Structure formats: structure tokens, C-alpha cells
């Protein structure tokens, strides 16, 4: 049994989802959103860092999946997103979690079967896979999808004797 944290980073709303990976699949543990309000950027980043740290302390995940930054039309938005992502990564690294990064296409492919799935399709698959009876908030749904993608990736590596794949540089850590 492994607890996995999924993070959908944002400078105003950061979604989180925690799932328990068992031999039979994944089970829902918790999800929600860290809302930072409209303060100064450094204050919002601190809220993201503290929020992720609290979630880790409360639920005790051992690994985290996080969405990669995509280049939006607005470079300023992409930079802020990257900074929020960095705050979440530092919180996880401070807690000793293994960290993996996934593109939005990888997450959609793993959860919905197609990299072109829309948010509603991803949410419906998250609800189906985790047997949820109520729709989660959209950012929480995305975070749960990231956690499911990470669980799927981890389980496909474990049978080959690999515990963590380092995508950068093509090196594997056994």
C-alpha cells in the first residue's frame, strides 16, 4: 500500500489529491484546493508551500506526481505557474517524497485513454476509477488524475524491478 499525492499547481488555486495504491488499484483518500487569494506573489507562494506541507504531514504520502508547466500564450502566467510548482516541489522535497513530473497529455492518456481528453472527460474517469459519488472541484479532479497517472506509471515500472525512473538524462535509479 502506497499513498500518492497529486498536485495541479497554480498561483491562485493549487489542486491536490491523495490516493492509496493497493494491489487491487487505487482508492480515494482526500482532495481539495489550496486557495491563495489575491495577495502579493511571494505571499501566495508561501501559502502553496505551507498548504502542501500540511497535506503531506496530515496524510503521509511517500511520493508525489506534479504537472509540468506548459507554455501558455501569456509568459507572465507561465512564470507564476512555474513558481507555484516550485513551491510545491520544495515542500515535497523537504518531506523526503519521491517526485515525478507529467505533462498534461501524459495525465490525460493515463486516465482517459487519450491525450486529447477534455477536463470533463478526465473528471468522469477520475470519478469512475476512484468510485466517487460526487464531482470533485475541477482543480482537485486534475490533481487526482495526476495521482492516478503517477500510480499507473509506478505500477508499470515495479514489475521490471524499477522503483523510480529519472526521465531527465535517461538514467534509472534502482
UniProtKB/Swiss-Prot annotation:
Reactions listed under catalytic activity: Endonucleolytic cleavage at a junction such as a reciprocal single-stranded crossover between two homologous DNA duplexes (Holliday junction)
Enzyme Commission number, as recorded: 3.1.21.10
PROSITE patterns associated with the record: RUVC (PS01321)
GO MF: crossover junction DNA endonuclease activity; DNA binding; magnesium ion binding
Compartment(s) of residence: Cytoplasm
Cofactors, names only: Mg(2+)
CC cofactor note: Binds 2 Mg(2+) ion per subunit.
CDD domains: RuvC (cd16962)
Keywords carried by this UniProt record: Cytoplasm, DNA damage, DNA recombination, DNA repair, DNA-binding, Endonuclease, Hydrolase, Magnesium, Metal-binding, Nuclease
Positions that bind Mg(2+) 2: 67
Residues holding Mg(2+) 1: 8, 139
GO cellular component: cytoplasm; Holliday junction resolvase complex
InterPro entries xrefs: RNaseH-like_sf, RNaseH_sf, X-over_junc_endoDNase_Mg_BS, X-over_junc_endoDNase_RuvC
Primary enzyme class: hydrolase
A Gene Ontology BP annotation from the UniProt entry: DNA repair
One Pfam family it belongs to: RuvC
Active-site residues annotated for this sequence: 8, 67, 139
Sequence similarity: Belongs to the RuvC family.
Chain's role: The RuvA-RuvB-RuvC complex processes Holliday junction (HJ) DNA during genetic recombination and DNA repair. Endonuclease that resolves HJ intermediates. Cleaves cruciform DNA by making single-stranded nicks across the HJ at symmetrical positions within the homologous arms, yielding a 5'-phosphate and a 3'-hydroxyl group; requires a central core of homology in the junction. The consensus cleavage sequence is 5'-(A/T)TT(C/G)-3'. Cleavage occurs on the 3'-side of the TT dinucleotide at the point of strand exchange.
Protein name: Crossover junction endodeoxyribonuclease RuvC
Name of the coding gene: ruvC
Amino acid at each position: 500500500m502506497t499513498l500518492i499525492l497529486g498536485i495541479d499547481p497554480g498561483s491562485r488555486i493549487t489542486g491536490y489529491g491523495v490516493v492509496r495504491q493497493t494491489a487491487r488499484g487505487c482508492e480515494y483518500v482526500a482532495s481539495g484546493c489550496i486557495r491563495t487569494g489575491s495577495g502579493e506573489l511571494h505571499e501566495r507562494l508561501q501559502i502553496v508551500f505551507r498548504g502542501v506541507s500540511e497535506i503531506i504531514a496530515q496524510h503521509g504520502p511517500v511520493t508525489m506526481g506534479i504537472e509540468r508547466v506548459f507554455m501558455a500564450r501569456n509568459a507572465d502566467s507561465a512564470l507564476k505557474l512555474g513558481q507555484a510548482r516550485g513551491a510545491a516541489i520544495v515542500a515535497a522535497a523537504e518531506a523526503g517524497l519521491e517526485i515525478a513530473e507529467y505533462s498534461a497529455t501524459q495525465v490525460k492518456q493515463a486516465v482517459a485513454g487519450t491525450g486529447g481528453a477534455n477536463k470533463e472527460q478526465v473528471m468522469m474517469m477520475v470519478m469512475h476509477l476512484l468510485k466517487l459519488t460526487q464531482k470533485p472541484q475541477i482543480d482537485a479532479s486534475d490533481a487526482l488524475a495526476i495521482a492516478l497517472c503517477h500510480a499507473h506509471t509506478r505500477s508499470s515500472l515495479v514489475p521490471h524491478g524499477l522503483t523510480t525512473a529519472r526521465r531527465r538524462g535517461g538514467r534509472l535509479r534502482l
